[in-house]
């Protein structure tokens, strides 16, 4: 995987949050990009031909990149999808210390923790703990702690990537 990409309502706010709160590094920004006299935006990006776009590419940890877009377009939907909606999504961050990470996020302006960290005991994910949180603009994210030796490992040779692998 090279990168994941998300459309955000305010690119400056999102870049600041990813850099200042989540520890990302800004690689570059481009924009505004627009092609008012052609159908380029629709043909290549699947958006309204009159859309304008700004983007930022971020390095997020040792092996991940994250591209953030801000579009302005006619007929643009302006609500974040829920996880249960088609196209719903969330971005998960591995943490070594769940309590410390939750306390850190609780101290960040505009961040909303959804409930409390949930330990998982049954089945393949025994040993995992997780909690969802919302960014200041409502994007769903997750903190996850998956220690080595998870229950699923006894049934397959496939191993999920862990930060310790890098």
Predicted regions and their residues:
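Short, structured motif recognition centered on aromatic/hydrophobic residues
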Residues: 1, 8, 55-58, 63-69, ...
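Surface-exposed interaction/gating patches
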Residues: 5, 25, 59, 74-75, ...
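Vicinal oxygen chelate
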Residues: 6, 29, 66, 93-166
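Core segments of cupin and vicinal oxygen chelate
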Residues: 7-63, 100, 107, 124-126, ...
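Short glycine-enriched loop/turn motifs at secondary-structure junctions
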Residues: 83-88, 125
